[in-house]
C-alpha cells in the first residue's frame, strides 16, 4: 500500500525527470502548476531570469464559493491566462509539476486554453 510519503517522493521524482526537458524563456514561459489538498496554484516562470512573471491561485479572494475543486481549477486557469495575455504572453510550456494530467490539473489546463493560452 502506498503511503503519503511514497506518493510525494514519486511525484517529486517525476517532476525532476520532466524538468530536465522543460525550460521556460521570457517569450515562452513555463506554466508551473502545484496542487495541494486545499488549493491549486499556477505561475508563469521565466527560467532564464529565475523570475515569476504572473501568478494565480485558488487562495485569492473570490474563490470562497468555489474552492479548489475542478470548477475552481478551471477558474484559476482562466485567471492566469487573462493575466498572461495582459502582459503579452500567449505561448507557454505546460509543467504539470509531476502530477498526473487528470482532474484538477487537466481542468486548469483546459481553462487556460479556453481563455487564450497556447500550449
Curated annotation (Swiss-Prot):
Keyword rRNA-binding attributed: yes
Any one GO BP annotation for this protein = translation
Record's keyword terms, sorted: Ribonucleoprotein, Ribosomal protein, RNA-binding, rRNA-binding
Which InterPro entries does this UniProt record tie to the protein?
A: Ribosomal_uL18_bac-type (IPR004389), Ribosomal_uL18_bac/euk (IPR005484)
What is one cellular component GO term in this UniProt entry?
A: cytosolic large ribosomal subunit
Q: Is-annotated flag, keyword Ribonucleoprotein?
A: yes
Which GO terms of the molecular function aspect are on file? Answer: 5S rRNA binding; structural constituent of ribosome
Superkingdom assignment: Bacteria
Q: Which family does it belong to?
A: Belongs to the universal ribosomal protein uL18 family.
What HAMAP family does this protein map onto?
Ribosomal_uL18_B
| Entry function | This is one of the proteins that bind and probably mediate the attachment of the 5S RNA into the large ribosomal subunit, where it forms part of the central protuberance.
Subunit and interaction comment: Part of the 50S ribosomal subunit; part of the 5S rRNA/L5/L18/L25 subcomplex. Contacts the 5S and 23S rRNAs.
Name assigned to this protein? Large ribosomal subunit protein uL18
Amino acid at each position: 500500500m502506498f503511503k503519503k510519503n511514497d506518493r510525494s517522493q514519486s511525484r517529486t521524482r517525476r517532476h525532476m525527470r520532466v524538468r530536465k526537458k522543460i525550460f521556460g524563456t521570457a517569450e515562452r514561459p513555463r506554466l508551473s502548476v502545484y496542487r495541494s489538498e486545499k488549493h491549486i496554484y499556477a505561475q508563469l516562470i521565466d527560467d532564464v531570469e529565475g523570475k515569476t512573471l504572473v501568478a494565480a491561485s485558488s487562495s485569492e479572494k473570490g474563490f470562497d464559493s468555489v474552492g479548489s475543486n475542478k470548477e475552481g481549477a478551471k477558474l484559476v486557469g482562466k485567471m492566469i491566462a487573462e493575466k498572461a495575455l495582459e502582459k503579452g504572453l500567449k505561448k507557454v510550456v505546460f509543467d504539470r509539476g509531476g502530477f498526473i494530467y487528470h482532474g484538477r490539473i487537466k481542468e486548469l489546463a483546459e481553462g487556460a486554453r479556453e481563455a487564450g493560452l497556447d500550449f
